[in-house]
Amino acid sequence: MAAILFCRSQPKPMRGLDLKQNELFSYTTLEQRIPNDHPLRPLRGLVDTVLASMDRDFDGLYSTLGRASIAPERLLRASLLQVIYTIRSERQLVEQIDFNLLFRWFVGLSMDERMWDHSTFSQNRDRLFNQDVARLFFQRIKSLAAWSEYASNEHFSVDGTLIDAWASHKSFIKKDGGDPPEDGTRNPDADFKGEKRSNATHQSTSDPEARLARKSNGDASRLAHMAHTMMEHRNGLIVDVECTEFNGRAEVEAALEMLERTAKPGSTVGADKNYDQKRFVQRARELKVTPHVAQKRKGSAIDGRTTRHPGYAASQKIRKRIEEGFGWLKTVGGLRKTKLIGRAKLSAQLLLGF
């Protein structure tokens, strides 16, 4: 009896109870849930400033008839989240925004607002997620007052990389009426040994704008598009982007187009040996841009008048950082292989990614 009384007199452990009780009311806001030092806070402020400056541009994209659509600002913020958090698909993006309070706050949804369907992105792709809107967004970011504090406007580097297309070798058939391989299954076997295949005679049925490409002699050929970037040298920020088909002239032509659009007279541009061509060097000098290209062993388009300066050595050292942007794009940005068909859509995705 004494033992029983002793047990009953033991203090109760102060352990919380695992009660599953849904609260009817919430006395907090999304704003209170997000830490003041969260890295998305300054990004949200920057994005809101840019989107506010595009208000009149958005008005021109929508009809005056019918019911109101989902705000374009929310769709673009959601697309940025997809890039930043490496979300594989728009279906997954919608699911995560629905239950993630941080994502809801960034997009501009309240805790009670219903999330839209994933097909909304496809329905708005031609209107909102196109090259023109993406480039306008990109240019407005560069026009912010704070941009000049981080980015140089005098020293740049250019380079290109391959982005795998959403197409397989089996879709690469003859242009004169060839048929894809068939064996009665959804994924038929195909043997291309001994067959000469080139972009002049073959074309992909999945993505007609993709080209059979390889970046170097030891690289495997695959269907791809080319992405080109221009990086400033102060902090390694990407200041311009182009998307082209793969051919022997694409890198030089895209680089010159970006120089015409971005570089001012008196600038320098670093590049690898592929840009050590008379056409690139001559046109860069016509734009009053000094070409700090890596020299070929034979037949270089530049000489000691360019390479003797300390700035040339600095450009050759810093230009290699442009590969970091490509690495980020293909890993975090999820663009090692695009899920979109055509260069126009890929170009918009590249601009939002950088």
Task: Identify what each model region corresponds to.
Residues 104-122, 291-293, 299-314:
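Phosphate-backbone recognition surface of nucleic-acid-processing proteins
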